[in-house]
Swiss-Prot record:
Domains as described in the record: Inhibitory activity is regulated via a pH-induced conformational change of the structure. At pH above 7, Gfh1 is in an inactive flipped orientation that prevents binding to RNAP. At lower pH, Gfh1 switches to an active orientation, which enables binding to RNAP and inhibitory activity.
Pfam families xrefs: GreA_GreB (PF01272), GreA_GreB_N (PF03449)
Gene expressing this chain: gfh1
Protein keywords: Coiled coil, Metal-binding, Transcription, Transcription regulation, Zinc
Binding, Zn(2+): E20, E24
Protein name, entry field: Transcription inhibitor protein Gfh1
Gene Ontology BP term (one): DNA-templated transcription elongation
Gene Ontology terms, MF aspect: DNA binding; metal ion binding; RNA polymerase binding
Family as reported in the entry's similarity comment: Belongs to the GreA/GreB family.
Keyword Transcription regulation found: yes
Species of the source: Thermus thermophilus (strain ATCC 27634 / DSM 579 / HB8)
Family matches, as InterPro entries: GreA/GreB_C_sf, TF_GreA/GreB_CS, Tscrpt_elong_fac_GreA/B_C, Tscrpt_elong_fac_GreA/B_fam, Tscrpt_elong_fac_GreA/B_N, Tscrpt_elong_fac_GreA/B_N_sf
Role summary: Inhibits all catalytic activities of RNA polymerase (RNAP) by partially occluding its substrate-binding site and preventing NTP binding.
SUPFAM superfamilies: FKBP-like (SSF54534), GreA transcript cleavage protein, N-terminal domain (SSF46557)
Length: 156
């Protein structure tokens, strides 16, 4: 049996939107490829080869998204008492007062550019957060080095 992929509801919806965009891109790439094939006298044309490669990349991305979504299990919102998959966690550096907001998600949803930053439960930081409660102080490896943070709030 294929392994399930745990996703938040928002993550599932985001991947569905990506799949729809990729399907639209595939239609456009197929159209361009057909036009190039019809107008090309030489099948070794580099433009034709590039179009074939782009179409193959899009098809691979669609296959990947369809695979993830077919195995998806949407997480129920947590109690907010203990950090788990899907939890949005507010952290505070006790020394500087700096605050950091992260959401613990599955690797399929991880994206450090999102706000809040979506970190994988399989990452060192994600693993360190799981199971903690408000008030707990934990040591995390961050891009700025090892730092201590206090769990200020847990949502979901």
């Amino acid at each position: 049996m294929a392994r399930e992929v745990k996703l938040t509801k928002a993550g599932y919806e985001r991947l569905m939107q990506q799949l729809e965009r990729e399907r639209e891109r595939l239609q456009e790439a197929t159209k361009i490829l057909q036009e190039l094939m019809e107008s090309s006298d030489d099948y070794d044309d580099s433009g034709l080869e590039a179009a074939k490669q782009e179409k193959a990349r899009i098809e691979a991305r669609i296959d990947s998204l369809e695979d993830i979504l077919s195995r998806a299990v949407i997480l129920e919102e947590g109690s907010g008492e203990v950090i788990g998959l899907g939890s949005v966690v507010e952290l505070e550096d006790p020394l500087s007062g700096e605050r950091l907001s992260v959401q613990v998600v599955s690797p399929a949803e991880a994206n450090v550019l999102d706000t809040p930053m979506k970190i994988s439960d399989a990452s060192p930081m994600g693993k360190a957060l799981l199971g903690h409660r408000v008030g707990d102080v934990l040591s995390l490896d961050t891009p700025k080095g090892r730092r201590e943070f206090r769990v200020v709030a847990i949502h979901g």
